[in-house]
Amino acid sequence: MFLFSRKTKTPISTYSDSYRAPTSIKEVYKDPPLCAWEANKFLTPGLTHTMEQHVDPEALQKMAKCAVQDYTYRGPISGHPYLPEKYWLSQEEADKCSPNYLGSNRYNTWRMEPYNSSCCNKYTTYLPRLPKEAGMETAVRGMPLECPPKPERLNAYEREVMVNMLNSLSRNQQLPRITPRCGCVDPLPGRLPFHGYESACSGRHYCLRGMDYYASGAPCTDRRLRPWCRELPTLCTSLRAPARNAVCCYNSPAVILPISEP
C-alpha cells in the first residue's frame, strides 16, 4: 500500500523496508494574482485596439423605448400562424354579444335564435327587398287569411323549462289578477288571463295561452312595427280544441293567434 505526498507526489510505502528517498522535483503552488485585466496573448502583432466610443444615455433610452413600442404594436401579419390576441374581445364587444344586453330585450334569454329576438329585423334575409307594388306583400295584405300562420313558439325543451319555472313561481306566491289585454278569458279557473306579446319579426301580436306568467310593462317597447290589439279589432282564434267546421285543422300547442280585419 502506497501513500502519495501532497508536496512531492512521491509514493511512500507504509513499510519501512520498502522506503526510498523522494527523487521528484519539489514545486511550490501559489495562488494566481488578482488582476482586473490581462493581456491578450493571442492578439495578432501589428493590430491595435479600437478606441472606446462615447455612448449617449439619452439615445440609448430612446432606442430601448422604440424597441419596446415596436414589439408591443407589431403588425397584424406575423410569421406565427396562430395569434390568440386576434380572438380576444374587449369588454364592450363582450357586452354586445351577451344575451342580457342584446337589443336591451329581456326576452332574449328565452330565445337565442337571431330572428326570434325583437331587436332583429322581421325579414330573414339581407338581400334588397322588392318594392311593395311588385312584391307579394301587397297581394297577401289584400286577401283575407283563411288559415292562420304557424305560430312562433318555443321548442319542447324550452317550453318544459319555462312551464316548470312558472309553476314553481306560482306555488310560492299568489299571482295577481290582471285585466285581460286582448279580451281573451281562460275558461280554466285558477289561472291568469291570456297575455300577448308583439313580435317584431312577424309584425303581429300573439296571445299566450296556458302559461301562468305576467310581466309588468310591454315586452317590445324598443320597436313597434304594428300597434297593439287595443287599437285594431282582432279576432282571436283558439287552436286548443278546433271544431269540426273549422277552416284550418292544425294540431299545435295552446296558442291564440290574432287575425286583423281588413
Swiss-Prot record:
Keywords per UniProt: Cell projection, Cilium, Cytoplasm, Cytoskeleton, Differentiation, Flagellum, Mitochondrion, Nucleus, Spermatogenesis
InterPro entries xref list: SPMIP6
Localization terms from the record: Cytoplasm, Cytoskeleton; Nucleus; Cytoplasm; Mitochondrion
One GO molecular-function entry: alpha-tubulin binding
Gene Ontology biological-process annotations: cell differentiation; flagellated sperm motility; protein-containing complex assembly; spermatogenesis
Quaternary structure annotation from Swiss-Prot or TrEMBL: Microtubule inner protein component of sperm flagellar doublet microtubules. Interacts with alpha-tubulin.
Protein task: May participate in intramanchette transport and midpiece formation of the sperm tail. May play a potential role in somatic cell proliferation.
Entry protein name: Sperm microtubule inner protein 6
Native source organism of the sequence: Macaca fascicularis (Crab-eating macaque)
